[in-house]
Regions:
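N-terminal targeting signals for export/organelle localization
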Residues: 2-6, 13, 17-58
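Hydrophobic beta-strand segments of well-ordered beta-sheets in folded domains
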Residues: 18, 77-81, 107-113, 130-132, ...
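Short catalytic/ligand-binding loop motif for oxyanion handling, primarily in non-cytosolic enzymes
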Residues: 22, 119-122, 182-184
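N-terminal secretory signal peptides
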Residues: 53-77
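Short active-site neighborhood of thiol/selenol oxidoreductases, capturing the structured segment around
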Residues: 69-98, 113
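Flexible, charged surface loops at secondary-structure boundaries
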Residues: 71-76, 104-105, 165-167
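Structural microenvironment flanking redox-active thiols in thiol-disulfide oxidoreductases
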Residues: 91-140
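Thiol/disulfide oxidoreductase modules built on the thioredoxin-like
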Residues: 142-193
Length: 193
């Protein structure tokens, strides 16, 4: 028991020590300020009422709300939302090119929401049919990833679907049919067979 408390105190000390020294902890926030000026110029901050359905993939990342994405998904027969972490090395995090090809073969629209900016521009942002999206921290009033995800998912799925106590909502893949939520998945198994 003492060992467990020691680990908790050590982790808390490291986390709060980093915060007080101004050291970023990757994944806690979006890291927009850490982008170069050239990369920041490639981020488009949209207005919540702006229609996004005709936006083409021009290599920029569009900051949107869950409601804006829901409007796009509602027009799709089958759609997959991938919460992409640009630096994830897990087998659950597949490449954008591979996933787009698999979705095309299955006639599924792929929408990619970037977890945070760090590493996003080191990839080819034009590998997907639709542009890459990011949760709009200006609209939601925070750049903290966990808070952003909660607010974004409520906008996307509605209060009836989203439940903080349901761990499956944090899976990387959300599948829709005829614009309606079907399920969340750890892997894109519905697409990649």
């Amino acid at each position: 028991m003492k060992k467990c408390w020691f680990i908790v105190v050590l982790c808390a000390g490291i986390f709060f020590g980093c915060r007080s020294l101004g050291i970023s902890v990757l994944g806690v926030r979006q890291h927009y300020d850490d982008l170069s000026k050239e990369e920041q110029a490639l981020v488009v901050w949209t207005q919540p009422e702006e229609f996004m359905e005709h936006v083409v993939n021009d290599g920029r990342i569009y900051a949107i709300t869950g409601k804006q994405l829901r409007i796009m998904i509602e027009k799709s027969h089958r759609a997959l939302l991938y919460a992409w972490n640009p630096i994830c090395k897990s087998e659950k995090c597949v490449s954008l090119e591979y996933l787009q090809r698999a979705c095309n073969e299955q006639s599924v629209e792929l929408y990619v929401i970037v977890d945070y900016f760090f590493g996003a521009f080191s990839q080819n942002t034009e590998l997907t049919d639709h542009p890459l999206f990011v949760k709009n921290s200006e609209v939601y009033g925070t750049d903290r990833c966990e808070q952003l995800s909660k607010m974004f998912l409520v906008d996307l799925l509605g209060n009836l679907i989203y439940n903080e106590n349901t761990e499956t909502i944090w899976y990387r893949y959300i599948y829709f049919e005829d614009g309606k939520f079907v399920k969340t998945m750890r892997e894109p198994s519905i697409i990649v067979q």
